[in-house]
């Protein structure tokens, strides 16, 4: 065994988020949501994700924040559960970046309408308000956001979290609902000025509404000029994978080569993509060990492993070997970046020998190990 005289930098520069289901955590471990037992189990998951170098977390605003409405219709917000969640993840080393969950949703892929989320709201008589979910550009939703967003930003500022917060608007907008998305973005700009927006999208029609683009690599490949132009304007470009892309593109499905989830993060380095997002840490249905092809959207199944990359164990999550490979790739990214500080051309040559393009990369373990050995040799010489 040869031990290298190299230390990973303490700063984690690559933004990594695997969205996780708190409901599944509670269900699989037999605890009630928001009970003390739940918080203990969630802490185990948070530390686990941090160990695997995740440093951003989707924060479910309308599960964590509740509201009270006075007789005049004015809302006050209770952030105590939100604070406990963020503080726990912060202490665990997971946050990092706070991803505010989506403010709106769509009922159909190509609908023109986006509808706004609302929190659980208590009325003066102690009953819960029965919200009617309305379109994002309606006067009712505007009135809600005019109260909610300033209160949220004020609270983030008071807690010292303002600069680490980014806001999702609606997941994967397409041309059909771009107008509604842009209207929602305009309200976020108005009521939460300076808050960066982020979403998984490849839709040109929402340009100007997105600060952090998160497209699939295949879409960047087909629209390189567009995404380069957005970066020149100061916007960030991350990448995400889900049930797509397939074919020659890297992904982290069970039946893909184990180098594939690792090399995703060599691709991060090669093209300067600042982050990586995946929707499915633990969104399995039924037996996580047997049901690996989640039936969604019906009647089609998701590719094997898309819905979850960890498994529920008796005392906490069990990593898959794909998750181990992903963590190794994130560490490789930091090593490449470390070498690039002193020998940029050398780091790029090593990376290019492994990932030649988004669809041309080595799956030969021997070739990969030799390239990584060259990386470690160069780092030892440089430091």
Where are these regions (language model features)?
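Short, hydrophobic/amphipathic alpha-helical patches that form generic packing surfaces
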Residues: 48-51, 81, 263-271, 331-339
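Weak global preference for isoleucine
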Residues: 6, 16, 25, 65, ...
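Catalytic-core region of carbohydrate-active enzymes that cleave or remodel glycosidic bonds
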Residues: 88-89, 212-302
């Amino acid at each position: 065994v040869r031990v290298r005289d190299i230390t990973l930098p303490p700063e984690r520069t690559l933004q990594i988020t695997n969205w996780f289901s708190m409901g599944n955590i509670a269900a699989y471990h037999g605890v009630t949501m928001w009970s003390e037992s739940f918080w203990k189990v969630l802490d185990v998951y948070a530390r686990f994700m941090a160990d695997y170098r995740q440093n951003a977390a989707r924060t479910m605003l309308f599960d964590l924040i509740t509201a009270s409405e006075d007789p005049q219709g004015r809302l006050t917000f209770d952030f105590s559960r939100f604070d406990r969640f963020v503080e726990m993840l912060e202490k665990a080393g997971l946050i990092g970046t706070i991803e505010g969950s989506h403010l709106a949703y769509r009922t159909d892929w190509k609908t023109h309408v986006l509808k706004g989320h609302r929190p659980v709201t208590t009325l003066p008589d102690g009953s819960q308000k029965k919200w009617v979910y309305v379109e994002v550009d309606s006067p009712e939703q505007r009135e809600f956001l005019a109260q909610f967003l300033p209160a949220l930003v004020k609270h983030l500022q008071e807690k010292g979290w303002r600069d680490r917060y980014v806001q999702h608007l609606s997941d994967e907008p397409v041309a059909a609902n771009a107008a509604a998305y842009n209207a929602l973005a305009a309200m976020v700009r108005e009521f939460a000025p300076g808050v960066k927006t982020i979403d998984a999208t490849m839709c040109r029609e929402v340009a100007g509404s997105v600060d952090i683009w998160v497209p699939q690599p295949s879409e960047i490949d087909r629209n390189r000029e567009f995404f380069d132009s957005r970066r020149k304007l100061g916007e960030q470009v991350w990448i995400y994978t889900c049930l797509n892309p397939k074919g020659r593109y890297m992904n982290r499905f069970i039946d893909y080569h184990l180098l594939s989830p690792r090399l995703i993060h060599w691709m991060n380095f090669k093209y300067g993509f600042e982050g990586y997002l995946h929707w499915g840490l633990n969104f399995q249905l039924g037996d996580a060990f047997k049901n690996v092809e989640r039936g969604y959207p019906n009647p089609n199944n998701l590719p094997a492993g898309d819905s979850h990359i960890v498994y529920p164990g008796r005392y906490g999550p069990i990593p898959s070997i794909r998750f181990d490979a992903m963590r190794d790739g994130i560490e490789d990214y930091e090593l490449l970046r470390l070498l690039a500080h002193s020998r940029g051309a050398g780091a790029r040559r090593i990376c290019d020998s492994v990932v030649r393009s988004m669809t041309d990369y080595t799956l030969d373990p021997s070739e990969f190990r030799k390239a990584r050995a060259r990386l470690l040799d160069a780092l030892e010489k440089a430091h």
